[in-house]
Regions:
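Structured N-terminal alpha/beta-domain signature
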Residues: 51-53, 83, 128, 160
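GT-A fold catalytic core of metal-dependent nucleotide-sugar glycosyltransferases
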Residues: 66-122, 128-137
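N-terminal anchoring/stem segment of glycosyltransferases
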Residues: 1-79, 222, 234-241
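Catalytic core and acceptor-binding pocket of nucleotide-sugar-dependent glycosyltransferases
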Residues: 127-240
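A structural signal for well-ordered alpha-helical scaffolds and beta->alpha junctions
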Residues: 32-39, 66, 121, 135, ...
Length: 241
């Protein structure tokens, strides 16, 4: 059994995501720069013995990334590994344990919107943990759904993964949601009003940014600005400690 930190960055030909992102410049390079900062922060703080697995290729459409990576992660899990998936726009700012802490599939905090598509507690999928010991039946329905991927819906991946999470026996919001493990900074940008942004984000998350373990910057909401924000937060929380 290995402990794996996994992420992917694909070069995507189409600029159409949930909107046309052509105005953001070279998105691939922005994400690669975020990835380097992010990985440095995980090397600094992620506890335990672990290896890094990186998937990198070229595809036509963003939804291909999500579908491909669903099966890539499943293949790694079938080999008997514990897997922590964290996208490149995540910054770890405190010593943090994942490996061996959970025995099932986990996500940790809400996304925006907090309810969606009939899922009352709709969690963000950019920080997620697959225990090697999780029940294999957890995968049965999600694999069928992933084979019939809805390429027209931006949230297809999160819909599948939320159903996978909440269909597990004993999962409740009370024993699942831990905001500090995946602080959502979707509403924080590097502007003159950043302190106000953070205050609103703290209220939304239910915890203060400085008390979090991972900050998810949401690079899809303006990659150039989120990259600069990541640099600032990395200096503040990691390089000055």
């Amino acid at each position: 059994m290995k402990n794996l930190l996994v992420r992917s960055i694909y070069k995507i030909k189409s600029t159409q995501w949930f909107r046309d992102r052509a105005d953001e410049g070279d998105i691939y390079q922005h994400y690669m720069q975020m990835h380097k900062i992010s990985l440095d922060s995980f090397k600094q703080h992620l506890q335990g013995d672990w290896e890094f697995v990186f998937f990198n290729k070229e595809v036509d459409d963003i939804q291909q990334v999500f579908q491909d990576h669903f099966f890539e992660l499943y293949d790694l899990w079938k080999q008997g590994n514990n897997i922590l998936y964290c996208g490149p726009d995540n910054l770890m700012i405190k010593p943090t344990k994942f490996f061996g802490e959970y025995n099932d599939f986990r996500m940790f905090n809400y996304t925006d919107p907090k309810s969606f598509n009939g899922i009352e507690h709709f969690l963000n999928a950019d920080v997620r943990y697959y225990s090697a010991d999780m029940n294999p039946d957890t995968w049965t329905e999600p694999l069928k759904q992933a084979e019939n991927w809805d390429f027209s819906e931006w949230n297809t991946e999160q819909i599948i993964l939320n159903k996978m999470l909440w269909n597990q026996e004993g999962r409740t919001p009370q024993n699942t949601i831990i905001p500090k493990m995946a602080y959502q900074a979707h509403g924080v940008w590097l502007t003159n009003d950043i302190n106000q942004h953070i205050q609103r984000a703290n209220a939304w998350n239910g915890c203060a940014i400085q008390d979090s373990h991972i900050i998810h910057l949401h690079g899809s909401r303006n990659a150039p600005n989120k990259l600069e924000l990541m640099k600032v937060l990395h200096r503040e929380f990691n390089e000055n400690t």
